[in-house]
UniProtKB/Swiss-Prot annotation:
Residues 17-26 have a biased composition (Basic and acidic residues). This is Aquaporin NIP1-2. The chain crosses the membrane at residues 66-86, 91-111, 145-165, 188-208, 212-232, 255-275. Residues 1-39 are annotated as: Disordered.
Length: 303
């Protein structure tokens, strides 16, 4: 009897040792599995859970990203260009500093609103710059660019319907809220390149570096936009964004100098993103905006 009990105990111990390791593998159809274990002495009881991700859910997730970019770009253009239209139609009631403040504030608010959903690009140049640095998938670039241009065009159409601007005639000419160079094309291209470089340099610093204060990313980006509009607005309109220029141009049918507002912002943001990457002194992996670690979080953990 004692021998049988010893054999049974030894067998139980062997089974307990064999059950210590649990392997979880993902199935080929998109399902994922995890395990939960409870320990009693040397025995481990493992229970596996499997969660299947339906392709329809993955498709809906991608659609939500596109929708966030459309809505974000729409409200940004509607507020920013709307301030321009209201200022023109009311004889300067908003004032130029007020226009700068509107652009900066609306960008700040929208960054805080949808950055955790789509990244809050709202700008084809920013999307392309992120892709060149490996922070955004190239296969998603076309859908993002289309969404941003669509949002800008919809906002421009809304402003045209509400205020009657953007068309022909004296009133349409007066209320045009697109971007046109006040000086030469070379001057406009150079200035758009510099302010786009500056914008993307700031975005790369506050929104993608895991050592930055991530909670202040929206404030920093919005302030940068306001500063750029303040000193470059009278010369070029301070576009920094091909979608911001293409939307009003397509609605009004005015394409003079539009190539400047496509080529200069794209080249400027790409150079700005790479310039910051050269200054980055860390071997840690790059993180998405939603997962950005910050100085404030690290300080709270230390305390």
């Amino acid at each position: 009897m004692a021998g049988r009990e010893d054999g049974a105990a030894a067998g139980a111990m062997e089974e307990g040792q064999d059950s210590k390791e649990v392997k979880c593998e993902s199935s080929e159809d998109g399902s994922s599995s995890s395990s939960s274990s409870r320990c009693h002495g040397n025995d481990v009881i493992s229970v596996q859970f499997m969660q299947k991700v339906h392709p329809w859910c993955m498709c809906m997730n991608k659609n939500l990203l596109i929708l966030a970019e459309i809505l974000g770009t729409y409200f940004m253009i509607f507020a920013g260009c709307g301030a321009v239209v209201v200022n023109q139609s009311t004889g300067g009631a908003v004032t130029f500093p007020g226009i700068c403040a509107v652009w900066g504030l609306v960008v700040m608010v929208l960054v805080y609103t949808v950055s955790h959903i789509s990244g809050a690009h709202f700008n084809p140049a920013v999307t392309v710059a992120f892709a060149t640095c490996g922070r955004f998938r190239w296969k998603q670039v076309p859908s993002y660019v289309v969404a941003q241009v669509l949002g800008s065009t919809m906002a421009s159409l809304t402003l045209r319907v509400v205020f009657g601007g953007g068309g022909g005639g004296a009133r349409g000419e007066h209320l045009f809220f697109g971007t046109t160079p006040a000086g030469s094309m070379a001057q406009a291209a150079a200035l758009e390149f510099v302010i786009s470089f500056f914008l993307m340099f700031v975005v790369s610093g506050v929104a993608t570096d895991n050592r930055a204060i991530g909670e202040l990313a929206g404030l920093a980006v919005g302030a940068t936009v306001a500063v750029n509009v303040l000193f470059a607005g009278p010369v070029t309109g301070a576009s920094m964004n091909p979608a911001r220029s293409l939307g009003p141009a397509m609605v009004a049918g005015r394409y003079g100098g539009v190539w400047v507002y496509v080529a200069a912002p794209v080249s400027g943001t790409v150079c700005g993103a790479w310039a910051y990457n050269l200054l980055r002194f860390t071997d840690k992996p790059l993180r998405d905006i939603a997962n950005t670690a910050s100085f404030l979080r690290r300080s709270s953990r230390r305390s």
